[in-house]
Structure formats: C-alpha cells, structure tokens
Design a protein with these regions (language model features):
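Aromatic/hydrophobic pocket-lining residues that form π-stacking "cages" and hydrophobic walls in ligand
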Residues: 1
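A Rossmann-like FAD-binding core segment of flavoenzymes
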Residues: 5-6, 11-30, 35-38, 99-202, ...
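Redox-cofactor binding/interface segments in oxidoreductases and associated redox assembly factors
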Residues: 37, 43-44, 83, 175
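Hydrophobic anchor at the start of a short beta-strand
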Residues: 41, 81, 104
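FAD-site-proximal beta/loop scaffold in flavoenzymes
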Residues: 48, 53, 59-77, 175-227, ...
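Glycine-rich Rossmann-fold phosphate-binding loop(s) that bind the pyrophosphate
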Residues: 85-87
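N-terminal Rossmann-fold NAD(P) dinucleotide-binding loop
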Residues: 90-91
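Generic hydrophobic/aromatic pocket-lining and core-packing "Φ" positions
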Residues: 94-95
Length: 246
C-alpha cells in the first residue's frame, strides 16, 4: 500500500504529532519535527492491544508473548499455548491457534466466557482447548524465552506456577483482553464513545467539519484490515469531494 500511494504522488513524512488545532478552517498539526496545515485531515491512527498487565510482560513481547494469532501462530507449532481473555476475540483466536499448537488453554478472570454462544460451543467442543477459570496472569519469566508463568486464582488467592515442557523450551502466551484506541492528541478534539473510539457517520465525518476518521480508531463493529481499507477509501472520496467545492 505504501508503494501504491507513492505511485500516485503521495508525500510520506515520519513525525510524531504532539498537538492538534482542529477548530478553524485550516487544521494545524504540530509535530516534533515540523508543523503541518490542511483544510481536511483523516485520523487513521489505529488501536493497539490492551496489555495483559503482568510482571515481565514488556521483556517477553516477541519472546513468547504475542497479541496476534494470525501473525505468530506458526511460531508455536506443536507447542503449548495460553490465551488471556474470554471475549469473542480471545475465543476465536484460541480456536485458530488449535490449528498449530498441540494444546491451547484459555485463562479467564471470570467463571464463564463472554464470547458469543456459538463461538463458546466450538471452543468447548474442541479437544485441544482447556480452561483456567477465575484466573489472571501475574508474572512471566524465562531464560530469554517465555518459560515460566504464575497464574493467580482471584477467588481463592491461590497461585499456580506453569512451566514449559523441557523438550519444548518455551510456551506461548497470547493476550486478547481488548483494544485501546490510539487517539492521542485527538482524544479531546473530536467526539468519542465511552471507550475512546472516535464517532463518525457512514461517510467517516467526525463532529468537527473537515476532520475524518478511518480504521480501528473509530467506532465500528468489525476491526480488520479489509474494513480499515474501506474506511480509508470512503474518507478519501469525501475529502476529494469537499476540495472540489473550492
């Protein structure tokens, strides 16, 4: 996609926006390197996975901890894998992981899943999937790779230490406990829902004239690459139409 935009003359600038003034006809974005002005802007800053919240998480990202099954499942072929979460995404990704891992254990802080009934039924019927109820991941560790995990039962207060099979050398831990919209400096400039996602209409307009939002950063029911691309196309067409009025 990057190369495609270059073919059409798009300019790419690497910068971090630290402030946004969106109330005027000309929108002003202040970055660490420069200041940018435009009559229209499209906010497409995405969303990122909510951290699992355990000690050692940062150290073992990419060394056993992942937040994307479709990206990393292949690395855990024939290994044991754990999934933190209990919603639709967690259970769907657990089901996907069973195509690669020899065993998948869902760790959920409640005593029942929050996923849709149809998805739950598939998980309960899958012989590769096990469950750790009323539990949260407290700490992870290892010798360069994820090899040890401490899980706490929040009802009993009991701690369980889980270790990788010696012949495997590691296990996987996937976090699917929600996403956080990457609204940054735009959070208090446009209308958002109670989770921080930007509200738009079907044409990607926000409540601020000349400001659009596309992709995972906006309120929507399905967050996938295909829907983000569609959002971007719609927003771009709307910007083009608005500019043709001048």
């Amino acid at each position: 996609m990057y190369e495609q935009t270059e073919q059409f003359g798009a300019e790419h600038v690497r910068d971090t926006i630290t402030n946004a003034e969106l109330s005027g006809d000309i929108k002003v974005l202040t970055g660490e390197k420069d200041t940018y002005q435009a009559k229209n802007i499209i906010i497409a800053t995405g969303a990122y996975a909510r951290p699992i919240g355990c000690k050692g998480e940062q150290e073992y990202k990419g060394r056993g901890i992942s937040y994307c099954a479709t990206c990393d499942a292949n690395f855990f072929t024939d290994l044991e894998v754990y999934v933190a979460g209990g919603g639709d995404a967690a259970v769907e990704e657990a089901l996907y992981l069973t195509k690669f891992a020899r065993k998948v254990t869902i760790i959920h802080r409640r005593d029942e899943l929050r996923a849709a009934k149809s998805i739950q039924e598939k998980a309960f019927a899958n012989p590769k999937i096990a469950f750790l109820w009323d539990s949260v991941v407290e700490e992870v560790s290892g010798d360069g790779l994820l090899q040890t995990m401490t899980v706490k039962n929040i009802k009993t207060g009991e701690f369980t230490k889980i270790e990788a099979d010696p012949k495997d050398g590691l296990f996987g831990l996937f976090g699917f406990i929600g996403m956080i919209p990457n609204t940054g400096v735009f959070a208090d400039k446009v209308e958002t829902d109670d989770k921080g996602y930007i509200k738009t209409d079907e044409d990607m307009h926000t409540n601020v004239p000349g400001v659009y939002a596309a992709g995972d950063v906006r309120v929507k029911s399905l967050r996938q690459v295909v829907t983000a691309v569609a959002d971007g196309a719609i927003a771009a067409v709307q910007v083009e139409r608005s500019m043709s009025d001048y």
